[in-house]
Amino acid sequence: MKSKIFRFLFLLSGVCGLASHALAAESSPITAPGPLGVLAGTFVNAGAGTSVVLMVPGSGPTDRDGNSALGQKPATLRQIADGLATHGISSVRIDKRGMFGSKQAVADGNDVTIAEYASDVRSWIGVIRAKTGARCIWVLGHSEGGLVALASAQGQADICGLILLSTPGRPLGEVLRAQLHAIPSAKTVLPQIDTAIDALEAGQHVDVQTLHPGLRGVFHPRVQDFMIDLFHHDPALLLKAYHGPVFIVQGGTDRQISATDDLPLLKAADPEATVVLLPSAIHSLADLGAVPATDGSLPIDGAVVPDIAEFIQKH
């Protein structure tokens, strides 16, 4: 069987007492048109006339709940969706084209661009507005999903605002370089790392046979076109060009997106944005040292859901 190559760029890739309340909201499958087949998601309906949040997952094989096929199961987006329902806010969380429930939307889940992901977001917005009658839709993105949210919002009047969770402020080539440089065992191959990323940033492909075996999966030929496209986008510039309400959440102990290197760039790009820094939260927005729930999920910081809900309700 032909092996699947998943994009994996981020290398280090609490809601308490909500379950009983979340049951009051109706959860059902929902689809949107994709290029070759449907895009799939889950609609949590908190009631007629409620605000709706569209949730875009992060990089690689990350599903609509925020769980990774590579083993990490924080369920960040599912927890947020269930939590928002208790505040009377509906949501749609989605699988990306070519993956999970949206596998049939395209022939190859690695043959994608940020612009195509953004196009899918706009397709979802049309479906959700038609289904709910909402005038506009909030778009929430986690990690790379925040970049997709920013790209989708350019010139779109039917987006209420953006909610950016653990979102890079630097181009992702710079983020990946920093992540790899932070790995102690990578010290001897740093020149190869820098050469490969420099080439991709310049729009050039990399011969993986010239790389250390441990780097060949990161720069696999099947993901290089996506990486070339991805590295071309500057989140801070996209945010600067967007003029709607923006809510930014960043974990202080996030090892993938930096509270010191990324967050200041986003704040500078939009001084009017509402920013919440959670000092002890990791990339998934769980507290550092959080004890996994029985389903393996990591309870997110208790401030995340009420802060998002308050921001939406104020706008």
Regions found by a protein language model. Name each.
Residues 281-285, 289-315:
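Catalytic active-site module of serine/aspartate enzymes centered on a nucleophile-bearing elbow/loop
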Residues 76, 109-130:
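Alpha/beta-hydrolase active-site loop
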Residues 76-103:
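Conserved alpha/beta-hydrolase
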Residues 163-238:
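Accessory cap/linker subdomain of secreted extracellular hydrolases
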Residues 244, 257-268:
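Short alpha-helix in the alpha/beta-hydrolase fold that links the catalytic acid
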Residues 242, 248-250:
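Short beta-strand/loop motif that positions the catalytic acidic residue
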Residues 48, 53-84:
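Short, surface-exposed "cap/lid" segments of acyl-processing enzymes
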Residues 25-48:
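N-terminal cap/lid segment of alpha/beta-hydrolase-fold proteins
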